[in-house]
Regions:
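Mature catalytic core of soluble alpha/beta enzymes
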Residues: 2-14, 21-281
Length: 281
């Protein structure tokens, strides 16, 4: 499989909108900003910890991942490694992150036929947003924050609920001339959701063996109970298959919790797997 470098430059392709939060009876804190060339939006029930402390923890995670693993920063450890023969200076944190990326891609490869293996340091950015979501989620649990919503550039982790109200999110209509929510839904359990698409940045994902993505393929969202990075990898791998029938068959045959939006008969259509529907029940 041959893919251009832009395969990895996953900007915000597909919005997952936050539509609702915990009950208004409980104060929900919102922290937002920019990171990794995109936005982040984090909401959580007010905890025993000072909000500034939590905000600092989040920023430290972003700084650490950027300084360690960004393939776009010339002074990052990964960039230094690529330009240097002195592997002794390659810190353990980079090795650990690389090993995690390889594990994620190997797992996705077993699910999606033809999925590219992230087996080189240039692939760090492939699941960086999903990985950062998972790290922040883990940190929140360490801080005993149980109800939260984390969204980094469309890669999302949702946990908890309050007073019988679930977190609500919506998927944006993938057609650029049709603004609005395509499909809203409630999240009734702890879930990660990631989406891949080409409509905001045409051609940035190249199909297997360098082929072009069918213009009828609009977007794919994947859910996973544990890992946002894994959902991120699966969504990208499925989208890169490039053909409507091939994507549908992979989702169906492998039991992937996915929502596939595509053009058919001159109108937008969607395919929801049985596993996707079950996770939303």
């Amino acid at each position: 499989m041959i893919l251009v470098a832009n395969f990895l430059k996953k900007s915000l392709l597909f919005f997952l909108f936050f539509l609702g939060a915990c009950s208004s009876n409980n104060e929900v804190v919102s922290i937002s900003g920019e990171t990794f060339g995109t936005f982040y939006d984090i909401k959580f029930e007010k905890s025993q910890y000072n909000i500034k402390i939590i905000n600092d923890e989040i920023n430290n995670i972003f700084i650490s991942i950027n300084q360690c693993c960004s393939t776009y920063k010339s002074d990052s450890l990964v960039s230094f490694k690529r330009d240097s023969k002195n592997t002794d200076l390659f810190k353990e944190e980079v090795k650990y992150y690389f090993q995690e990326v390889v594990k994620i891609s190997e797992k996705a490869n077993k699910t999606v036929e033809g999925f590219i293996l992230f087996d080189d340091y240039d692939y760090f950015n492939a699941v960086a947003k999903g990985y950062a979501v998972d790290i922040i989620s883990t940190k929140f649990k360490e801080l005993n924050i149980e109800d939260f919503f984390i969204n980094i550039g469309g890669e999302i982790r949702v946990e908890g609920m309050k007073n019988n109200n679930f977190w609500k999110i919506g998927i944006e209509n993938p057609l650029p001339n049709q603004l609005g929510i395509f499909k809203p839904f409630e999240i009734k359990q702890s879930l990660s959701i990631a989406t891949s698409g080409n409509y905001r940045n045409p051609g940035h994902i190249v199909g297997i063996e360098g082929s072009k993505i069918d213009q009828n393929v609009l977007s794919i969202s994947v859910m996973d109970k544990k890992s946002t990075a894994y959902a991120d990898a699966l969504a990208t791998g499925l989208f890169a298959l490039g053909k409507v029938d091939l994507i549908k068959n992979n989702i169906r045959d492998n039991g992937i919790p996915a929502l596939f939006i595509y053009k058919g008969d001159e109108k937008i259509q969607s395919f929801e797997s049985k596993q996707w529907k079950e996770l939303l029940q």
